[in-house]
Every structure is written in C-alpha cells, then in structure tokens.
Amino acid sequence: MACLLLCGSAFAQEKVYTLQECLNEGLQNNYSLKIQRNNQQVSDNNATLGNAGFLPTADLSGRYSGSSQDTETKLRDTREIVKENGIFNQTIDAGVNLNFTIFEGFNVSTTYKKLKELQGQGELNTRIAVENLVAGITAEYYNYIQQQIRLKNFKYAVALSKERLRVVEQRYRIGNFSGLDYQQAKVDFNSDSSAFMKQQEALQSSAIALNELLARENLNVPIAVADTSIEVASELQFEHLMSSMMENNTSLLSARRDSRLAMLDYKLKVSQTYPYVRLNAGYGYTLNKYNKGANYHRGSLGADFGVTIGMNIFDGNNLRRERRNAKINIENARLEQTDMEQTLKSDLYNIWQAYRNNLQVLDLEKENLVTARLNYEIAMERYMLGDLSGIEMREAQKSLLNAEERLLTASYNTKLCEISLLQISGQVQAYLQL
C-alpha cells in the first residue's frame, strides 16, 4: 500500500512539458547550439577597430647587452704595444615605440566592413542553428505524440482482439464455434499483442531522440507532454509565405551576405594598388657603461619619429591575377544567390503542394474514420448474433485500425509540411510563442 502511495505521488508530481517548454529547454542546453554561439562570439570579438587596423600599435621594450674584449694596440710614434684585457662595456636601452598606418589604399576601412559582415554572418549561422533546432524539436515532439496515439490504437486493437477471443472461446466450449475459429482468434490476438510491444519500442526511441535534442543527461527516460493530439494550422497563405521567404529565409540572407563579402574581398585587392603612408615614433633612454677610457658612462634620453611612404610597383603580376580571381568570386556569389532563390522557390512550391494535399487527405480520413467506426459497431453486433464469420469480423477490425492509422499519418505528415513551410519562410520561431 505504501509503495502504491509513493508511486502515485511520484506520478502526480511528474513534470508535463508543453512544446514551448521543450523548445526553451533545448535552446538553452543543446550542445550543437552552444558551439555555434561560441563561434558567433569569436566573430563578435574579431569585429573591432583595432583588428581592422584603425588604431595604432605601441610597444614597450627593454634591452641589456654587454661585451668583454681583449685589445692589443701598437702606437704609431713609439711602436709600443699596449694590451688591455677584460674590457667590459654595457648598454641598457628602454623605450616606447608607436606605429600607425595613416593610409593604405582604403584597406583599413574595407577590412573593418568585412569584419562587420563576418560578424553578421556569424549571427545568421546562429539563427540557422536555432531554426533547425526549433524545427527538429517541434517535429520530434509531434512524432512522440504520434507514437503515443499509435500505441493507444494498438492497445485498443489488443482489447478488441481479446474480447473477440473471449467470445469465441466461450462459444467454442459450448460447440457454437469450431476449433479453427478459436485458433484464428488466438492468432489475431497474438499478432495484435506483438504489434503493441513493437510500438512500445518505437515510442521509447522517439523519447530518446527528443531527450537528445533537449540535451538531457538521462536519455532513456519517458517524457510527459501536454498535448495529446496533433493540431495543424490550415490557414497558411502561399503569397505570405513566398514574401516572407524572400525577406527572411536565413540561407538566402546568408547567400546575399556572401555576395557582399566577395565584393569586399575585391576591394581589398584593389586597395593594394594604392600607395601607403605609415608613421612611426619612439621615445626612449639609453645608458652606456664603459670599463676603460675617459668616460665612465653616458646616457641619452630622447624621441625619434619617421614617415614611410611606399607603393607596390610590380609583384610579378600576382596582384592582377588576384583581382581577376576576386571578380570571378563576385560572379560566383551572385550566381549562387540566384540559384539559392530558385531552389527555395522550388522547395516552397513542392512543400505547399504537399501541405494542401495532406489537408485534403486529412479531411477525407476524418470522414473515413467515422464510417469505419460505424461499420465496426454493426459488424460487432452481427458477430455477437452469429451472423458474421470470424474472418469478416477481423476485416472490420482491421478496417477500423487502418482508418485510425491513416488519419494519424495524415495528421503528422501535414504537421511536418507546416513546420517546413514556416522554416523555409523564416517564421519557424513562431512555435516559441505558442
């Protein structure tokens, strides 16, 4: 009794997750998304004025050096040879050096623009990862519901077969049914029981897949979801989806950004044909210590500066080759963008057609299920009266189960089309607001 109370209490306290809660948990914990966010942070860190070359560089340096020498000098007047051994001189330097590029053919400003574009590309890549994860979690969430409903249908099939087996067994014992009827009912019951057990495995596999997307530590734990049916949106409009896709599709936005990056790469090559102006300045102190001679030490403190002006005159035509290749890359980026637009339009047309077709199939299967249930009820009444054979009863049962399965499949397929339409149009994050 105590065990039952504890189990009941644990079941009552089990967390029930809505789709939005699953999405929020996945967006917070998914490892692939965390990696992409780290990559975005790298591109954010790189998009700085200093990395582009707008800011000067300053170095603080210090140096110590010494020399030990033995000298031998022959005097011109007296022909005397003077030897000095162990002459030890020392030099100490310390200073600050400043370098600044004043002009480099617009290379610095173009580099900064490229870094900002790369930063935006990193944000787009993160958005793509988020949209893929939202679509993946949503699809698996409803697949889990699909597997739960299918398990319920199989359980219902087992109950029907069990009831049929009970009726046949009773009538077989009193001689109303043959042994063949009894054996067939038993085979059908075992077949439905086997299908039920296999469906339990499919449900567990879906739970594992959903837990993996949510980055949960324990993957093999069933998850309780709030929804018990698959509701589909039937109000989507093609014109709105097309317009939204052309404006918001992340893959298309990424292709457009690639075109801008290709143009900036070309400008960087062109900038190398301009002259450059660089400024350098320094301020430091130097101390020399002498072991011999009239001076014991000498120190100097001061500044130095300079301006360097230069220009690339000839580099073996490599720069010209690189500019030509950069132009080709611009054309390729434009073609890839156009190809991406065509591919997305084609995908949208195909998914839309599948979506509309599945909506019609869904309505049809709802009607079929009503008819199949009515047929089963009539068949069951005739079977109980002995006017229907076991095989005919089994066919009525299979007709009902098949109708339930077709309706379930149509519902899930329509939901997948809905998810794909929202994703391709850049609106899949709307599931976060449900």
Which stretches of residues belong to each language-model region?
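A short glycine-centered flexible hinge/capping loop motif at secondary-structure junctions
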Residues: Y172-N176, Y383-D387, I424
